[in-house]
């Protein structure tokens, strides 16, 4: 931060620079009040000091004093508001950074000199009644604008009131501006419509437009013919109307896009499912036809001619010779007599079938023969043996009704286990009755 010079340094540096420059320096003022006089007014005597050149430096400050520009004139001064400048042109310069400190000091000193020059009379004596030199210098420092420095300014911005063009009406100014391109309009429209359309990001990208978009998205871009820029209506009103119309078009186009998005795949899926179903049905029918064809061929191999049966082709069964043999110039060997052929054997599972009555009778006869053979070897009591045979035959006839109730597997197990009738041979009637009882029980279990 630069340090401003004190008031005493400013007073010591004031003075006339020379006749060559346009700035006249007023020497430092010393006010002496007349105490011995009886006059009410106080006279201020101005003592002039030795004038300095423009490039001379003060012993107390290393700053140089610049020249005052010729186009700046002070016309009016007021103690409350400062100095007002009545000139139509002002020059604002951007000082160089190397001499910023010098410019600030020189501007303050020059403003003080110009203020004193305006207040002083031609004779160099000024009368001050209520304002002291220090207050006047401070006011001039705060009110007078900074004059340009003597060094070269890098950039200058000239503002002249007389050269300002007259501002055209807003209607003509708006007509002179070119209309904005459609992508920029869409770039402002889509962020407003994005919350209303949840599928916006899937179809439209605001910055660019390519041919991959659907056709109904090009409608907001095209402007209607009654909104062309060559008309006299303001462009911003036309843009607002086009924005509203584009929003309406988008609202009208959105249900169609929604319908196309959600309904289209259902039709596609239905078509695909129907095609797959028809393909499966065709395959099943082909398989069935192949199976039926094989079955038909197998059935007709016995009814066709012998030549077709050897060739393993379908015979038309024309008699006496088939048409296939005549067409292929083969000798037809004739047909086989099917009445002499045995019936086809069927491989059935007979494990669960019930035995027939003839088989049961044969098994019973075998059992009786085995029992009779064992009893005939006994020579001790023939009468008992005949009684045993009769009792066995009677019990066997009574047990025929129980054969249907006993399973065949259980009967086979009993028949496989032989009964020992030749253990203890009984010589009494009680022994013979025991043998008969054993045989009857065995018959019941069969």
Swiss-Prot record:
Biased composition (Polar residues): 1-24, 67-86, 121-144, 387-401
Assigned keywords, A-Z: DNA-binding, Metal-binding, Nucleus, Transcription, Transcription regulation, Virulence, Zinc
Record Pfam families: Zn_clus
DNA-binding positions: 305-332
Low complexity bias spans: 30-64, 87-97, 104-120, 185-195, 358-369
Residue ranges with Pro residues bias: 166-184
Localization (cell): Nucleus
GO BP term (any one): biological process involved in symbiotic interaction
Keyword Repressor among record annotations: no
Major place of residence: nucleus
InterPro entries (alphabetical): Transcr_Regulatory_Proteins, Zn2-C6_fun-type_DNA-bd_sf, Zn2Cys6_DnaBD
Induction comment from the UniProt entry of this chain: Expression is induced by HAP43 under low iron conditions.
Keyword hit for Ligase: no
Residue span of region Disordered: 1-203, 336-402
UniProt-recorded name of the protein: White-opaque regulator 2
Gene: WOR2
